[in-house]
């Protein structure tokens, strides 16, 4: 059985940056956000169901899902969020578990923003949390996604608080510093964790 390291953190914490550093070391990465995008690509059955429910205006001109519009819609209408989650979550979980089962590397990095909220930590042998100050989260998310502070604060409120997240952590990467100046530090931390996870995985599979 592949050793599973669950990677999580709040919005704007830098999960993708950390995941890419592990990926550069040859570690297979399964990202819930990537899976969520892949299962609703143009022409997919799930996208058709989303269009039937929300209408054609939820699409971009090229026929792809307009994620910004969808995000704003479910922010304004909680009942739509419930419907969407009921549609997508089983499909996302099924695809992630399929990908986990076919891995042959000693361990896999499983990137799930709502790892704790969706009670998925039980699937992990180790939990790695990317931790930042709430102010950093807001600043980064606003710059990255061009979202309103209202929407970002709403997303943060829907996630577990920082203290709760840290209680689930076996390992923590502090990521408040500016990325450009802090990248060597992050690379070194990821390399240290990589060696640690290889040892743990090899011990489990011995």
UniProtKB/Swiss-Prot annotation:
One annotated GO biological process: coenzyme A biosynthetic process
EC numbers for this chain: 2.7.1.24
Residues annotated for ATP binding in this entry: 12-17
Cystine crosslinks: none
Compartments in which it is found: Cytoplasm
Catalytic activity: 3'-dephospho-CoA + ATP = ADP + CoA + H(+)
CDD domains assigned to the protein according to its UniProt record, in alphabetical order: DPCK (cd02022)
SUPFAM superfamilies for this protein: P-loop containing nucleoside triphosphate hydrolases (SSF52540)
Keywords per UniProt: ATP-binding, Coenzyme A biosynthesis, Cytoplasm, Kinase, Nucleotide-binding, Transferase
Matching Pfam families: CoaE
Entries under Gene3D superfamilies matching the protein: P-loop containing nucleotide triphosphate hydrolases
GO cellular component: cytoplasm
Pathway info: Cofactor biosynthesis; coenzyme A biosynthesis; CoA from (R)-pantothenate: step 5/5
One annotated GO molecular function: dephospho-CoA kinase activity
Residues of the DPCK domain: 4-204
Main location per the UniProt record: cytoplasm
Domain of life, source organism: Bacteria
HAMAP family: Dephospho_CoA_kinase
Protein family: Belongs to the CoaE family.
Function: Catalyzes the phosphorylation of the 3'-hydroxyl group of dephosphocoenzyme A to form coenzyme A.
Protein name: Dephospho-CoA kinase
